[in-house]
Curated annotation (Swiss-Prot):
It holds the Pfam family Trns_repr_metal. It comes from Citrobacter koseri (strain ATCC BAA-895 / CDC 4225-83 / SGSC4696). Keywords: Cytoplasm, DNA-binding, Repressor, Transcription, Transcription regulation. One of its GO terms (cellular component) is cytoplasm. Belongs to the FrmR/RcnR family. Its main location: cytoplasm. This is Transcriptional repressor RcnR. InterPro entries: Metal_Tscrpt_repr, Metal_Tscrpt_repr_sf. It is found in: Cytoplasm.
Length: 90
């Protein structure tokens, strides 16, 4: 079973939290708010996205790299995660 399926409820809860934070940010932008409050909300969204990414990466590394017995498959999976990290960190 895929780690994203096994952890689906936890990951969906994180995604829902992010969605709520984005909705709150959009409301903040429609009304006058202090810049600091807007920046804090953006930082909170970024932190939540980073947390979601961390959980999915941890699951991927554990299931597809650490516990992968097929060396070719492990190398392929590692390459995939490295490409994703490159695009995420840009």
């Amino acid at each position: 079973m895929s780690h994203t399926i096994r952890d689906k409820q936890k990951l969906k809860a994180r995604a829902s939290k992010i969605q709520g934070q984005v909705v709150a940010l959009k409301k903040m932008l429609d009304e006058p708010h202090e810049c600091a409050a807007v920046l804090q909300q953006i930082a909170a969204i970024r932190g939540a996205v980073n947390g979601l990414m961390r959980e999915v990466i941890k699951g991927h590394l554990t299931e597809h790299i650490v516990h992968q017995s097929d060396e070719v498959k492990r190398e392929d999976d590692l390459e995939v995660i490295l490409k994703v990290l490159d695009s995420y960190i840009k």
